[in-house]
Amino acid sequence: MKILDKPKIQLPADTDEECIEICNILNKLPNTETCESCQGHGKHTFWVFFKCTDIDVLTRLGRAVDRRYSDGNWEILVDDTDREPRGRFWLRAKHQYDVSAMEESVKELCDNILYWFDDKFDEDFNS
């Protein structure tokens, strides 16, 4: 699957530094755009809201967070609020991290997303 060379959108100036890499990767995916993100600030878990209208992208993202193929610390949930009519999802850490553990887990997640979006998996994921 083709990942764009650069993100489709510019992140807001107040984006948490720890969120920039994962948001940029998600924004490079087809039919996908981040909406909000937060690194947690020691009060809650790291999370990113994103819109996606491509089932193949969602399937690969699901594989990237699947505990069989990752550290198992991440999940993707459907955002079922009234704010968005459809296609909004919530990528979040399952628990809070100290800063160094969070950075390590986010880096592993980013690497894992890029791994599963490699062209070698196109036949496995295209609908």
Spans of model-derived segments:
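Structured alpha/beta or helical-core interaction and ligand-binding surfaces enriched in interleaved
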Residues: 1-127
